[in-house]
Curated annotation (Swiss-Prot):
It is found in: Cytoplasm. It catalyses: cytidine(1407) in 16S rRNA + S-adenosyl-L-methionine = 5-methylcytidine(1407) in 16S rRNA + S-adenosyl-L-homocysteine + H(+). GO terms for cellular component: cytoplasm. NCBIfam families: nop2p, PRK11933.1. This is Ribosomal RNA small subunit methyltransferase F. It comes from Escherichia coli (strain K12). It holds the Pfam family YebU_pre-PUA_dom.
Length: 479
């Protein structure tokens, strides 16, 4: 694999020499950092099983190497990466997999280790959505996830990825993560804090990642991380699990943050060792039971993961002084909900008791039941999935609902050819050789729902959202 030149400040190299255990070679560390990062993907098991995905993609000649800590994760090698970007493949467009760095799959593996099955989870720093979507798949779209993102510009990306993967059990918020301890104390069974960090572990992906690095900035970042983990710990219920992770390598932002929490709440913090998380995990194990992953150990990004249990309640923080404002939705009454469900079933949309119907003016939404306890405590950017808009002639079903709820075995499903599917993703109407009979057509490709179309004569009117329309070369190889 080709080398690339990474910029290393001298003070960083000194710090790494001190931080690296004697069992590891510093020369191996430098050599690993100069190698470009291996690409990796995670199969979205909400859409397809790993076995079916491997069968579907077998003709492509992809080399898929299993990632030891994630059953759905694979390192991927492709001969035609330049000819067709991974993100333009049909399987990516329909949400069958997520392009995710291998080591970033570790925190969610830790969160669900030892049979942990949380029902209400918070992802404190969620964008772009790799870990939120991984959590949802582990929960099988049940329970509820609060996915928070402080950066306004990244909330839109977070929602796009959640929608593409067919996820229905997520509520999005846009806050500084330090508010949650006071706003929603002891509300979560599990919390993932993948903390903002100095990014020392990402040099294989970004050779200039350390251009603005300094020991002083590490100290400032660590101070913020302590405030974030303190807030998250308050939001965790007694008995709950907190996973703290970063993509950096210094101890100040990693071990020291977790040790600070234990010193602050000595009777309430228990470190849960991760040495048995996967075969070979002990190679990265610290004396506290954390995983400090230097890039040469597993040939991946540098990463840090700690798992903690809250063994008892801690003193509450002062209640927040802000007002959340009125919640603009109201529950749909049972009789009307039955009518809506019947109409939705007619176009192939079905949901279970984990989701409940709510209404705002002419909009119909499905919210995860597990999030209702948070209504009035935080303001949501987006909640659940938008099912439909009502109009005089019935319902205008929404694309995100089709992707999350549609059954490809429904009688109104219509399978497109590769050329027709590509036209669909380009936002164009489709003219199939044999037009379907139904007026409302569930459009599928590779037996996966990709949208809902109106049949007008021999034409299928495209309803693919404009913001998702793709240009350039797609999976048939035509530009």
């Amino acid at each position: 694999m080709a080398q690339h030149t990474v910029y290393f400040p001298d003070a960083f190299l000194t710090q790494m020499r001190e931080a690296m255990p004697s069992t590891l070679s510093f020369d191996d560390f430098l050599a690993a950092c100069q190698r470009p990062l291996r690409r990796s993907i995670r199969v979205n098991t909400l859409k397809i099983s790993v076995a079916d995905f491997l069968q579907l993609t077998a003709p492509y000649g992809w080399t898929l190497t299993p990632i030891p800590w994630c059953e759905e994760g694979f390192w991927i090698e492709r001969d035609n990466e330049d000819a067709l970007p991974l993100g333009s493949t049909a399987e990516h467009l329909s949400g069958l997999f997520y392009i995710q760095e291998a080591s970033s799959m570790l925190p969610v593996a830790a969160l669900f280790a030892d049979g942990n099955a949380p029902q209400r989870v918070m992802d404190v720093a969620a964008a772009p959505g790799s870990k939120t979507t991984q959590i949802s798949a582990r929960m099988n779209n049940e329970g509820a996830i609060l996915a928070n993102e402080f950066s306004a510009s990244r909330v839109k990306v977070l929602h796009a990825n959640i929608s593409r993967c067919g996820i229905s059990n997520v509520a999005l918020t846009h806050f500084d993560g330090r508010v949650f301890g006071a706003a929603v104390p002891e509300m979560f069974d599990a919390i993932l804090l993948d903390a903002p960090c100095s990014g020392e572990g990402v040099v294989r992906k970004d050779p200039d990642a350390l251009k603005n690095w300094s020991p002083e900035s590490n100290q400032e970042i660590a101070a913020t991380q302590r405030e974030l983990i303190d807030s998250a710990f308050h939001a965790l219920r007694p008995g709950g699990t907190l996973v703290y992770s970063t993509c950096t390598l210094n101890q100040e932002e990693n071990e020291a943050v977790c040790l600070w929490l234990k010193e602050t709440y000595p009777d309430a913090v228990e470190f849960l060792p991760l040495g048995d998380l996967f075969p070979g995990a002990n190679k990265a194990l610290t004396e506290e039971g954390f995983l400090h992953v230097f890039p040469q150990i597993y040939d991946c990004e540098g990463f840090f993961v700690a798992r903690l249990r809250k063994t008892q309640a801690i003193p509450a923080l002062p209640a927040p002084k802000y007002k959340v404002g009125n919640f603009p939705f109201s529950p749909v009454k049972d009789r009307e909900a039955g009518q809506i469900r019947q109409a939705a079933t007619g176009v192939g949309l079905n949901w279970d008791e984990n989701l409940r119907l709510w209404q705002r003016d002419k909009e119909l939404w499905l919210f995860p039941v597990g999030i209702e306890a948070l209504i009035g405590k935080v303001r949501f950017s987006r909640l659940g999935i938008k099912l439909a808009e009502t109009h005089n002639k019935g319902y205008r079903w929404q694309h995100e609902a089709v992707i999350a709820l549609a059954s490809p075995d429904n009688m109104n499903a219509f399978e497109l050819t590769p050329q027709e599917a590509e036209e669909w993703y380009r936002g164009r109407d489709v003219y199939p050789q044999a037009a379907p009979v139904a007026d409302d057509v569930l459009v599928t490709f590779q037996h996966q729902p990709i949208g809902l179309a109106k049949r007008i004569g021999s034409r299928l009117k495209n309803s693919y959202p404009r913001e998702l329309v793709r240009d350039g070369k797609l999976f048939t190889g035509n530009a």
